[in-house]
């Protein structure tokens, strides 16, 4: 396609006469009445993308005399500055030479320039409000093949400048598909200093309606206004899927390219079609990875979550979203963004698709036979190459020129680093490896070994992925069981709490009653514990006296109120010293007294221990059942069962054995 002529002509836009010429595919204007220049167009000629243009305009241009034009005819929009400020801006960014036809134009001579003659052409039907085409998509069962059909379009040698056709800012910033050198009908990128023909672009012939114009104003100057209010409550006549520029983009394409999450959600709420395509069959998700806005704002994860069902779409050149990502790596400053987009999509795919389906999409070839790995290797984007290889990307798939990713990787090893740096600005050159650091470039022998080892590495990765998925499923099942048990426990706690709340509500004195009952139980426990100690002491005294009576005249007496004591026996006061007439030696008597005292201390210690055992044992229904059984066997009431009877029963049972 022939490039546009740089000859200056006169045109009228929005009722304003301008001198116009086309430089690098950009319409550059100079107003006739005051010679003011469009600073936005100058920055486009200097190859600034939209975020960069916005920053330069805010920080350098709009601080001085300027006029901001919004609405009206698309090409006339932008920030206009006095002639000398425009010349200074062009000189600063080294485009004054290429812009000399418009900058050096003598106004007196310019008056003799005739308006550009419009070509007589049959009017095309209006495409405003049309829906974009649905994208070609790849299901998991059809990822083995590649759509190699090339677009069949006629190339027009000239472009008419019409008042009724919109050429909006930003349309030329699109990153095109990989050029097909063998195809004369391939669409060329604006980076090739050409523009798309009218027949291919299908420029809008009807003026934008109020909704579309409001949306375009927001997209072109988002820093200057809020989101259009009608999006929060879309009116019935608002067509959310209508085309709003001459590349066939809808509002959703623009919002996704900008990474504006709130705008995307509002458009989706208004029933925007996530699968709508522009004239190259590019979906909004594809457009979102062409620019770095989603990387700068770290919003791509949210965009991907909203548009994930279109990941498998391909455009008219058979390119998947992976192709579009790695295409941008021809610009070194976009490699980090491309790596970010790749990782996000690969992680999402591996979570929703079998591994083999992910591999098929990664190895998909476009209409030129290029895989995403081949393009990344050709551009020298080693970070992207490593990411793709980790998902079994095949470096041995040839394109139509019989070139493979392996060859580009080997060439990258052989190419000197200085040569790589000199090629850093190459666009789609097969020898462009910009951005590779010396540490990445390994010796040729190691590269050969690496390429040969790739199939083995891929197999190991597949086995590892299968084992990981198996273990992950087991852990997920364990987690489900644990969560179910946790939920049951929480439900039981909730029911218990509800019952407790109900009891407290129906019985206001419930808490006080419980405290009283607990206190009474503790007092009863203390009393029973003391009585048990007294009972044990009495039992031991009784047994001791009975065992000593046949052998000695020693008599042990204890106070008559002994059983009424609360603390049981003491060691020194409760017993009277025994009268022993058989002991004549006072020393022996004292020894016996000391021994007896020691035995009493030991006895009391053992008694306390026995009481503790009784307290821990308690009396349950089984013990009571035994008491009733023994009482019935002896023909007495359970209440009359005494220690003497129990001892007699025990002695009788022992003799029988």
Curated annotation (Swiss-Prot):
GO MF annotation, one: RNA polymerase II cis-regulatory region sequence-specific DNA binding
Induction of expression: During conjugation and nitrogen starvation.
Ranges annotated as biased composition (Polar residues): 148-165
PROSITE patterns (UniProt xref): ANK_REP_REGION, ANK_REPEAT, HTH_APSES
Highest rank taxon of the organism: Eukaryota
InterPro entries per the UniProt record, alphabetical: Ankyrin_rpt (IPR002110), Ankyrin_rpt-contain_sf (IPR036770), HTH_APSES_sf (IPR036887), KilA/APSES_HTH (IPR018004), SWI6-like (IPR051642), Tscrpt_reg_HTH_APSES-type (IPR003163)
Keyword annotations: ANK repeat, Cell cycle, DNA-binding, Meiosis, Repeat
Bias type Low complexity, positions: 136-145, 176-191
A single cellular component GO annotation: cytoplasm
DNA-binding segment(s): 39-60
Composition skew (Basic residues), residue ranges: 114-134
Domain HTH APSES-type residues, every copy: 8-115
Subunit structure: Interacts with cdc10 and cdk9.
PANTHER family documented for this protein: ASPARAGINASE, TRANSCRIPTION FACTOR MBP1
Protein task: Required for the initiation of mitotic and premeiotic DNA synthesis. Has an additional role in meiotic division.
Name of the featured protein: Cell division cycle-related protein res2/pct1
């Amino acid at each position: 396609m022939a490039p546009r002529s740089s000859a200056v002509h006169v045109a009228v836009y929005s009722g304003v006469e301008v001198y116009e010429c086309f430089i690098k595919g950009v319409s550059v204007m100079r107003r006739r009445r005051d010679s003011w220049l469009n600073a936005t167009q100058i920055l486009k000629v200097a190859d600034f993308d939209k975020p960069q243009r916005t920053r330069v305009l805010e920080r350098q241009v709009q601080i001085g005399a300027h006029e901001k034009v919004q609405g009206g005819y698309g090409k006339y929009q932008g920030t206009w500055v006095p002639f000398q400020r425009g010349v200074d801006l062009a000189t600063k960014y080294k485009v004054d030479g290429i812009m000399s036809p418009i900058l050096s134009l003598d106004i007196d001579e310019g008056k003799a320039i005739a308006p550009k003659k419009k070509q007589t052409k049959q009017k095309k039907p209006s495409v405003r409000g049309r829906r974009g085409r649905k994208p070609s998509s790849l299901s998991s069962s059809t990822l083995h093949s590649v759509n190699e059909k090339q677009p069949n379009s006629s190339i027009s040698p000239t472009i008419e400048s019409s008042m009724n056709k919109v050429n909006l800012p930003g349309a030329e910033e699109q990153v095109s598909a990989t050029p097909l050198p063998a195809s004369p009908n391939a669409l060329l990128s604006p980076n090739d200093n050409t523009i798309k023909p009218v027949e291919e672009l299908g420029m809008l012939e009807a003026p934008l309606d109020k909704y579309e114009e409001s949306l375009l104003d927001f997209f072109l100057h988002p820093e200057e206004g809020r989101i259009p209010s009608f999006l929060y409550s879309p009116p019935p006549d608002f067509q959310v899927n209508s085309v709003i520029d001459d590349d066939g983009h809808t509002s959703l394409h623009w919002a996704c390219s900008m990474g504006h999450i709130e705008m995307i959600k509002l458009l989706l709420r208004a029933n925007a079609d996530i699968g709508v395509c522009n004239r190259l069959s590019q979906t909004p998700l594809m457009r979102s990875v062409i620019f770095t806005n989603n990387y700068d704002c770290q919003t791509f994860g949210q965009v991907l979550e909203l548009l994930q069902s279109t990941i498998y779409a391909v455009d008219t050149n058979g390119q998947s979203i992976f192709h579009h990502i790695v295409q941008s790596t021809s610009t070194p400053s976009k490699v980090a963004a491309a790596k970010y987009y790749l990782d996000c999509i690969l992680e999402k795919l591996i979570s929703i698709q079998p591994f083999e389906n992910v591999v098929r999409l990664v190895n998909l070839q476009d209409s030129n036979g290029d895989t995403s790995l081949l393009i990344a290797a050709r551009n020298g984007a080693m970070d992207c190459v490593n990411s793709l290889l980790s998902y079994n990307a095949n470096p041995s798939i040839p394109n139509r020129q019989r070139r493979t990713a392996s060859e580009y990787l080997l060439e990258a090893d052989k190419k000197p680093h200085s040569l790589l740096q000199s090629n850093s600005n190459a666009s789609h050159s097969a020898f462009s490896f910009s951005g590779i650091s010396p540490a990445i470039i390994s010796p040729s022998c190691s590269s050969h070994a690496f390429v040969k080892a790739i199939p083995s590495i891929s197999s190991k990765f597949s086995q590892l992925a299968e084992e990981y998925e198996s273990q992950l499923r087991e852990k997920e099942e364990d987690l489900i069981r644990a969560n179910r048990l946790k939920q049951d426990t929480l439900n039981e706690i909730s029911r218990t709490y509800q019952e407790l709340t109900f009891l407290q509500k129906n019985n206001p004195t419930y808490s006080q009653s419980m405290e009283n009952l607990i206190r009474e139980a503790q007092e009863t426990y203390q009393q029973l514990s003391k009585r048990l100690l007294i009972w044990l002491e009495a039992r031991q005294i009784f047994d001791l006296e009975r065992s000593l009576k046949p052998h000695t005249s020693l008599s042990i007496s204890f106070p008559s109120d002994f059983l009424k004591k609360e603390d049981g026996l003491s060691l020194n006061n409760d017993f009277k010293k025994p009268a022993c007439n058989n002991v004549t030696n006072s020393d022996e008597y004292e020894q016996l007294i000391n021994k007896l005292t020691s035995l009493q201390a030991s006895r009391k210690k053992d008694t306390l221990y026995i009481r503790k055992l009784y307290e821990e044992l308690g009396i349950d229904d089984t013990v009571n059942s035994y008491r009733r059984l023994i009482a019935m066997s002896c023909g007495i009431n359970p209440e009359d069962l005494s220690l003497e009877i129990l001892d007699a029963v025990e002695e009788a049972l022992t003799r029988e054995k």
